[in-house]
Amino acid sequence: MEEGSVKAMRKHALIVGPRRVGKSTLIRKVIETLNCSVAGFETKKESKMEDETLGSPIYIHTIGAPWHYSEENLLGYCKNQKTQRISDAFNRYADKLLQPVPEGTILCFDEIGFMESKEKAFCDAVLERLDGDIPILAAVKDKEIPFLNQVRNHQNCKCFFITEENRDKLVDEVLEFMKNQIEK
C-alpha cells in the first residue's frame, strides 16, 4: 500500500505526551470548538480525596454522564507518582466502550495509559474501537509499553506529539484533522 493511501485511512487523533503537558486541556479545547456529540471516558486523579495510606483515588467517568465516585468506577490509587491498580477495574468498563453511539458522535478516550495495559478486555475494546470508523480523539501516555505502542502504531491513528512549546498551536492542527474526520 502506498504511503499516501495509508495516511488517507487515518481516522483517529492521538495526543501523545508526558504527564502534565496539557493533553487533556488540548482535547477539551478541541471538543468545545467541534460542537458535536461526544461519548467515551475520562480518567481523573482526585487529589482532594487523598487517603493518607493509599494516596489519591483514580476514577473513570463516562463522558456526558454525571460524575460519581464509587467502587464501580474506582480504578486504583496514586501515591508519590506510583500507581496501584485495582485488579479488573478497567475490564469492568470494557463493555461501555463498545456500546453503540449515535451517528455524528466522536469518541474521546482521556486517557489511555499504563495502568490498563494488563486488563485484556479493556485493551481489546480500545483496539476494536480503533479498528472502527467512528472518529476518536484520545490522550495517550508516552511510555514504552507494548499496549501503548500498539495503540500509537495503529494504522488508523495519527499521533500528535504535544510539548509545552507546541501545545497552543497544536489545538488548531488537531481541530482541523478532527473536522475532516467528521465530514467524511
Regions found by a protein language model. Give the residues of each.
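Hydrophobic positions on the alpha1 helix immediately C-terminal to the Walker A/P-loop
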Residues: 26, 30
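Hydrophobic anchor at the beta1->P-loop junction of P-loop NTPases
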Residues: 15
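Phosphate-binding P-loop
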Residues: 2-10
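N-terminal phosphate/diphosphate-binding loop that engages ATP/GTP or pyrophosphate donors
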Residues: 31-81
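Conserved lysine of the Walker
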Residues: 23
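The conserved Walker
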Residues: 19
